[in-house]
């Protein structure tokens, strides 16, 4: 607990046998667990206990996994450092003076510290991959629709996916095997994962694989990060892969488009937290608007408030076309860029994060710095593509991750390539 990786420690025993029998799993605290607090890292939901399990939780338990706790996170998933949590920041187990990444920082820290064998996070703009990179573990964001979101407390519905965090690529793939597949409770899910065997794909055989390297996702990155990334590419070439330069000009606008869309969706999704149906009460003194305002001012932290306000502004009548519409057009451009690129390459590679893990407290006073750290991860969410972060050594004693992005439902390809980086 010295890392503050868990908000709630508990034991939820799974089935007597199954592929996860004897395996401990930590679950991010925005994934519903019946009768166990699911706070989303917020004062607003500090006492909330869901009346049902998320589909992925049911999958875990049916596979024999044992849930050992609900992990700390940036409030409602809004952050890149796990410092915006109402329950305090999580520390990076590699260096406790630094952030673990976010928003699934508690999940990554728990796995890296050995407090859980595996973990679940959610990834809206990099929230599984960023903490995996910063904590030196593996994090995988599945294709949108591969894993059920039923029971995930929504931040930005069109962007987010639940994904595994593990010490190894094979471990992440094994957990993906358990949670992937269609769900009658989530109309966005597809059949693609029903018969897949992701763990068997982690062979590391990249002979003949073509890897695209976009300059747009290395420009401006820390030199130490780029050095480790280039070394990983050299290792892949030595194993028979080919690397080629590709262009993704749309990625220059990805962060801006992502934040407009995510904040806009958040302003709608979080409207339900008004102190009446959910959340802390506003006291019901005065009129309803005052009551709602009091409840939300008391229940939400600064970053969540900022994003709700910006999202509401972007959707407002006078600015919808200027911001939200243009962001959606940029999103379509990102998707088109990737589609054209995957006509020529099998995977796209970049550093997961452009910088090394910041010191605790460094980003809180400069939210723009925090937003820009998502430059390499947000494009995969905008394009609804699978992406994995795998450790690629360290720089000055701090972990560096390599990100591999694949075409839709190309999880097996990126898992195979990630296994080669890992070796």
From Swiss-Prot:
Q: Which InterPro entries match?
A: Amidase (IPR000120), Amidase_CS (IPR020556), Amidase_dom (IPR023631), AS_sf (IPR036928), GatA (IPR004412)
Q: Which PANTHER family match?
A: GLUTAMYL-TRNA(GLN) AMIDOTRANSFERASE SUBUNIT A, MITOCHONDRIAL (PTHR11895:SF7), TRANSAMIDASE (PTHR11895)
Could you give a single Gene Ontology term from the biological process aspect?
translation
The active site consists of: 28, 103, 127
- The enzyme's main class, written as a single word, is ligase
Instruction: Spell out the protein name for this chain.
Output: Glutamyl-tRNA(Gln) amidotransferase subunit A
GO CC terms = glutamyl-tRNA(Gln) amidotransferase complex
Subunit architecture = Heterotrimer of A, B and C subunits.
| Entries under Gene3D superfamilies matching the protein | Amidase signature (AS) domain
Q: Does the keyword Amino-acid biosynthesis apply?
A: no
Q: Which UniProt keywords apply?
A: ATP-binding, Ligase, Nucleotide-binding, Protein biosynthesis
Q: Which family does it belong to?
A: Belongs to the amidase family. GatA subfamily.
Q: List the disulfide bonds.
A: none
Cited function: Allows the formation of correctly charged Gln-tRNA(Gln) through the transamidation of misacylated Glu-tRNA(Gln) in organisms which lack glutaminyl-tRNA synthetase. The reaction takes place in the presence of glutamine and ATP through an activated gamma-phospho-Glu-tRNA(Gln).
Q: Which NCBIfam families match?
A: gatA
- Keyword ATP-binding carried by entry: yes
Q: Which domain of life is it from?
A: Archaea
Q: Name one GO molecular function term.
A: ATP binding
Which reactions does this protein catalyse?
A: L-glutamyl-tRNA(Gln) + L-glutamine + ATP + H2O = L-glutaminyl-tRNA(Gln) + L-glutamate + ADP + phosphate + H(+)
Gene that encodes it: gatA
EC no.? 6.3.5.7
């Amino acid at each position: 607990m010295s890392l503050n990786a868990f908000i709630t420690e508990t034991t939820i025993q799974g089935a007597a046998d199954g592929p996860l029998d004897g395996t401990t799993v930590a679950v991010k605290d925005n994934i519903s667990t019946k009768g166990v607090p699911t706070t989303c890292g917020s004062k607003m939901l500090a006492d909330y206990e869901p009346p049902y399990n998320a589909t992925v939780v049911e999958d875990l338990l049916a596979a024999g996994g044992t849930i050992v706790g609900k992990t700390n996170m940036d409030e409602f998933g809004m952050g890149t450092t796990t410092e915006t949590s109402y329950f305090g920041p999580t520390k990076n187990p590699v260096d406790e003076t630094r952030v673990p990444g976010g928003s699934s920082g508690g999940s990554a820290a728990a796995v890296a510290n050995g407090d859980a064998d595996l973990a679940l996070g959610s990834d809206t703009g990099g929230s599984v991959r960023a903490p995996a990179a910063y904590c030196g573990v593996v994090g995988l964001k599945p294709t949108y629709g591969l894993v059920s979101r039923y029971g995930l407390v929504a931040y930005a519905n069109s962007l987010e996916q639940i994904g595994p965090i593990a010490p190894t690529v094979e471990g992440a793939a094994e957990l993906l095997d358990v949670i992937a597949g269609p769900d009658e409770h989530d109309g966005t899910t597809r059949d693609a994962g029903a018969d897949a065997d992701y763990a068997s794909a982690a062979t590391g055989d990249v002979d003949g694989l073509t890897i695209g390297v976009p300059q747009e996702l290395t420009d401006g990155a820390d030199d130490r990060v780029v050095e480790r990334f280039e070394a990983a590419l050299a290792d892949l070439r030595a194993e028979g892969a080919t690397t080629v330069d590709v262009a993704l000009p749309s990625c220059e606008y990805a962060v801006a488009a992502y934040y407009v869309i995510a904040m806009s969706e958040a302003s709608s999704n979080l409207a339900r937290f008004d102190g009446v149906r959910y959340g802390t009460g506003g006291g019901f003194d005065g009129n309803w608007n005052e009551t709602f305002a009091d409840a939300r001012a008391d229940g939400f932290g600064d970053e969540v408030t900022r994003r709700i306000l910006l999202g509401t502004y972007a959707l407002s009548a006078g600015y919808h076309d200027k911001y939200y519409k243009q962001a959606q057009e940029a999103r379509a451009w990102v998707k088109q860029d990737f589609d054209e690129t995957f006509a020529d390459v099998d995977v796209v590679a970049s550093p997961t994060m452009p910088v090394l893990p910041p010191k605790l407290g460094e980003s809180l006073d400069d939210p723009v710095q925090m937003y820009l750290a998502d430059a390499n991860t947000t494009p995969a969410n905008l394009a609804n593509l699978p992406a994995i972060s795998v450790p690629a050594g360290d720089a000055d004693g701090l972990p560096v991750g390599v990100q591999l992005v694949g075409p839709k439902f190309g999880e097996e390809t990126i898992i195979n390539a990630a296994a080669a980086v890992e070796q």
